[in-house]
Amino acid sequence: LDLAKHVIGIASKL
């Protein structure tokens, strides 16, 4: 799963 990557992507946007 790429949940971690998804979370990192969202955090990077913020």
From Swiss-Prot:
Respond yes or no to whether keyword Secreted is given for this record.
yes
Q: In which tissues is it expressed?
A: Expressed by the skin glands.
One Gene Ontology cellular component annotation? extracellular region
Q: Which residues form a coiled coil?
A: none
Q: Where found, per UniProt?
A: Secreted
Q: Name one GO biological process term.
A: defense response
Any idea which residues bear Leucine amide here? L14
Going by the UniProt record, its keywords in alphabetical order are: Amidation, Amphibian defense peptide, Secreted
Q: What function does the entry list?
A: Lacks antibacterial activity against Gram-positive or Gram-negative bacteria.
Q: Which protein family is named in the record?
A: Belongs to the frog skin active peptide (FSAP) family. Brevinin subfamily.
Name of the protein in its database record: Fallaxidin-3.1.1
Q: Which organism is it from?
A: Litoria fallax (Eastern dwarf tree frog)
